[in-house]
Amino acid sequence: MQESLVERHLKTRLESRGFKVLKLYTPGQIGSMDRLILRPTYWPGPPYFIEIKRPGKKPRPLQEARYNDWRARGVAVLAYVDSLEAVNQTVDMLFAASYDAYMRTTGMSL
């Protein structure tokens, strides 16, 4: 399976739940995350960064160092997804976290 299939699946699943998914281009900044994920406007919370890998591949040491640096600065970094199942788990987790934040701030359900 190609990385592009995992990437498309992530984008489709998140956008179907109201998230905005942006591809990042960071010239001169090796090791940056692939995607920026913005929550729906009515759900408060930080954006997330996520790395997409081919199945079975892991982030390079430079990428891990970059992720750790960003986390130390308070950035919400999701390590990486490398399969359709990992995408599904990540989307479910993001949706649940966003829904919980919505409930805490409004006291209302969707």
Language-model features, listed with the residues they occupy:
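Active-site-adjacent loop/helix micro-motif of nuclease/hydrolase catalytic cores
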Residues: 56-65
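Short amphipathic alpha-helical segments and helix-helix/interface helices
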Residues: 11, 64-68
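Basic, glycine-rich
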Residues: 76-110
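Acidic-basic catalytic patches of nuclease active cores, encompassing PD-(D/E)XK
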Residues: 1-26
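Short, solvent-exposed loop/turn segments that connect beta-strands within catalytic domains
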Residues: 41-46
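A generic structural signal for well-ordered alpha-helical segments
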Residues: 14, 70-71
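Conserved catalytic cores of phosphodiester-cleaving nucleases, focusing on short active-site segments
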Residues: 35-37, 48-54
